């Protein structure tokens, strides 16, 4: 008998077949750099910076920017942001810089130039007659890169959210060490003409390069990062959620994974911790691999590890976290089963803590405490078994152990307890649910059972 086949009849004829479907529709690409070359892009001929500044500023005032010219200017303007490297900077075997080296954002990447001239048109009224200062260049760079952040804000954020962000960004680039170069609200007006610029590979690359630089190098103009910070861990919402989750429940990654009682986690965990990736190395190219063009399809997105993502946010919902209640459910990744496991894990880690004395008046008190704890441990090991085995969980110090939690789930037939359902309904019903969010899922699924 072939375990992969099913047998049935069609018009009295016996049919035997394997029901096969595409399980994983995405081809994930890991961002490892194997040729020891820095990430690179090719742009047009390097411009005269003074001429380029005047042209780009003119375009901003007219809400008419040429993306090729903007990218060419942003790459050339990197020379204004020199800083000292605090330590040897190595990523994927590439020596980016040595400690004490003077570097600019250009040091992180390889920007190649052709002989193709830019347009550098003047479209926005009167031409600036004098040459711009460095603070003016810094302000223009900051405003241009902020177009990336604004274009990444999704339509789910309703009301004046995007306008408020744009206003706050403009305020930053109107005050020292920056200088006001455009009228207020110009950024939002310009953004409407560049709403999809986050999809332009070269613009995305430059935003990621600036962000990687300013996230490590202390600099007078580090606030430029306000527009580029969204390039860090871009398309890594699954990995970022897992990192936040283990901090939230105060466990290591290894300890947390012992609670993941479902076969569908296996492939996702293998994918998330693929050997050779610099997931745990600060200031690595890994952090900006999407913007730097090192991967076409992220293996770390919420869709790539959907079961992990769903579980984490069901636990977050149980704990009443707004971020989890607002997150979007991955509908194809067993949300009903993940909500059950999330209820049990939420119960374990919500409103409970593991506490012990760690600080003492003097060394004598410390020694007395340690001796008393040792005696307790020895007594526990010599237990005569008078506690009913069914109640062992409630008397053992290991009630939070993966084994104890798994046993409770199995004893309840893999179903949520009424207390879990009441908690889910309580947190979700008091929250204004967004479409397809975890709050909406919990409301629709469990409100009738409460």
From Swiss-Prot:
GO terms for cellular component: helical viral capsid; host cell cytoplasm; ribonucleoprotein complex; viral nucleocapsid. Phosphorylated by host CK2. Unphosphorylated protein N seems to have a better affinity for leader viral promoter encapsidation. Phosphorylation of protein N in ribonucleocapsid may stabilize the interaction with protein P, thereby playing an important role in viral transcription/replication. Its main location: virion. The keyword Magnesium does not apply. The modification Phosphoserine is found at residue 389. Keywords: Capsid protein, Helical capsid protein, Host cytoplasm, Phosphoprotein, Ribonucleoprotein, RNA-binding, Superantigen, Viral nucleoprotein, Virion. The keyword Cell inner membrane does not apply. Homomultimerizes to form the nucleocapsid. Binds to viral genomic RNA. In nucleocapsid, binds protein P and thereby positions the polymerase on the template. Protein P acts as a chaperone on free protein N to prevent it from aggregation before encapsidating genomic RNA. Encapsidates the genome in a ratio of one protein N per nine ribonucleotides, protecting it from nucleases. If expressed without protein P it binds non-specifically RNA and therefore can bind it's own mRNA. Interaction with protein P abolishes any non-specific RNA binding, and prevents phosphorylation. The soluble N-P complex encapsidates specifically the genomic RNA, with protein N protecting the genome like a pearl necklace. The encapsidated genomic RNA is termed the nucleocapsid (NC) and serves as template for viral transcription and replication. Belongs to the lyssavirus nucleocapsid protein family. This is Nucleoprotein. It comes from Rabies virus (strain silver-haired bat-associated).
């Amino acid at each position: 008998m072939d375990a992969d086949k099913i047998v049935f009849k069609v018009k009295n004829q016996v049919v035997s077949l394997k029901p096969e479907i595409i399980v994983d529709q995405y081809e994930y690409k890991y961002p490892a750099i194997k040729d020891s070359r820095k990430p690179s892009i090719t742009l047009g001929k390097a411009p005269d910076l003074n001429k380029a500044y005047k042209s780009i500023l003119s375009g901003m005032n007219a809400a008419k920017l040429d993306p090729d010219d903007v990218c060419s200017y942003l790459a050339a303007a990197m020379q204004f942001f020199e800083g000292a490297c605090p330590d040897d900077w190595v990523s994927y075997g590439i020596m980016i810089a040595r400690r004490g080296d003077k570097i600019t954002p250009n040091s992180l990447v390889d920007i190649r130039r052709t002989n193709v001239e830019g347009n550098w048109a003047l479209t926005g009224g009167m031409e600036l007659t004098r040459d711009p200062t460095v603070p003016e260049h810094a302000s223009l760079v900051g405003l241009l890169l902020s177009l990336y952040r604004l274009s990444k804000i999704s339509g789910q954020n309703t009301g004046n959210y995007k306008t408020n962000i744009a206003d706050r960004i403009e305020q930053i680039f109107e005050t020292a060490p920056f200088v006001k170069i455009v009228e207020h609200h110009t950024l939002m007006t310009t953004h409407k003409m560049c709403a999809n610029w986050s999809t332009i590979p070269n613009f995305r690359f430059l935003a990621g390069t600036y962000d990687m630089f300013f996230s490590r190098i202390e600099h007078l103009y580090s606030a430029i990062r306000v527009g580029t910070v969204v390039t860090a861990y871009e398309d890594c919402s699954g990995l970022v959620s897992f990192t936040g989750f283990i901090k939230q429940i105060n466990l290591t990654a290894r300890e947390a994974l012992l609670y993941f009682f479902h076969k569908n986690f296996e492939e996702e965990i293998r994918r998330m911790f693929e050997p050779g990736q610099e997931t745990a190395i600060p200031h690595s190219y890994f952090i900006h691999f999407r913007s730097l063009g090192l991967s076409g399809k992220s293996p770390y997105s919420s869709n790539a590890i959907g079961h992990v993502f769903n579980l984490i946010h069901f636990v977050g919902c149980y704990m009443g976290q707004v971020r989890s209640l607002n997150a979007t459910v991955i509908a194809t990744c067993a949300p009903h089963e993940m909500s059950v496991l999330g209820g049990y894990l939420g119960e374990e880690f919500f409103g409970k803590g593991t506490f012990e004395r760690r600080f003492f008046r003097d060394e004598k008190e410390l020694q007395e405490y340690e001796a008393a704890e040792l005696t307790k441990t020895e007594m526990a090991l010599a237990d005569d078994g008078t506690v009913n085995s069914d109640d062992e969980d409630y008397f053992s110090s290991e009630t939070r152990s993966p084994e104890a939690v798994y046993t409770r789930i199995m004893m309840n037939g893999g179903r949520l307890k009424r207390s879990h359902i009441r908690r889910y309904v309580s947190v979700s019903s008091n929250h204004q649910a967004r479409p397809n969010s975890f709050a909406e899922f919990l409301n629709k699924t469990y409100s009738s059972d409460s």
